[in-house]
Amino acid sequence: MKINEILREQIKNEIPRERCCLVTALKVALRLYGTLHITGRGFMVEFKKEDPALLRRTIRLFKAVFPSHKDLEILFDDKKYWVQIYGPRSVWQELNLFSEKEGFLPDVSVTRDCCLMQFVREVVLYKGYLVNFEEGYQLEIREPGPFTGILMSTLEKWEIKHYSYPGRLLIKGGEHLFAFLNRLNCQETVERLARYREFKKDKDQTVRLTNYSMANLNRQVDGYEKIRLVLEEIRKGPGLEALPPPLREI
């Protein structure tokens, strides 16, 4: 498994238990990759994602939040799947896709601490990347878009050191990254990343020892080749028997 997939796999496979956290997970997914339409059948949200596992996860989340809602259509072509979900205004209002006062796409509302943690987990799932991991611990959150303000205020609240650049946030260094992951209850990922890091160290050490041994072997071969040429000249000249016993033994 690639290093970047370790964190995503844990978050993707862990479905929240509380309904408020399920709603928060849906808010992030649909705001990032959903499109709200007005059709003859009412409001419809179309969710597209190239990763079918994330599409299935979103459908599972929606059914968990709205178990009585059955109006879902799963479509596909040769390259990807997507889902169309029809529902009344009340559904999309709860998911912060529509507001009677603000209209379409109002600000995302996250209040409870458990929901805030789930919010950050979902953003990391879709927008987080572990980069240059062989050189050092570093997590990049790319193009968080409408969630930038909430992310930055949350990191400051959690006292996680981070760096802000246009279109991305960075968390650098093992101490800060592991503190961030522990805040997200991603201890399994922390342990796996630590094992991965040790594996890389052992692998690099093995490569260095192998290169050192090969260099020594090459020097020995080169030295033997030089001696062989000298001995060949002696054999063609006076002969090995003409040498004193100590030199002949060498």
Segments predicted by a language model, with ranges:
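Structural motif
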Residues: 15-23, 108-116, 241-246
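Helix N-terminus capping/helix-initiation residues
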Residues: 18, 51, 173, 216-219, ...
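Short acidic (Asp/Glu) and glycine-rich catalytic loops that position anionic groups and cofactors
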Residues: 36-38, 132, 162, 228-233
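N-terminal, positively charged regions that mediate nucleic acid binding
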Residues: 1-42, 48-58, 62
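Contiguous, well-ordered alpha-helical segments that form the cores/surfaces of helical PPI scaffolds
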Residues: 26-31, 120-125, 248
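Extended mid-to-C-terminal alpha-helical interaction segments
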Residues: 183-250
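DNA-contacting interfaces and partner/effector-binding or oligomerization modules
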Residues: 40-41, 49-197
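Alpha-helical structural motif
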Residues: 3, 7, 22, 54, ...
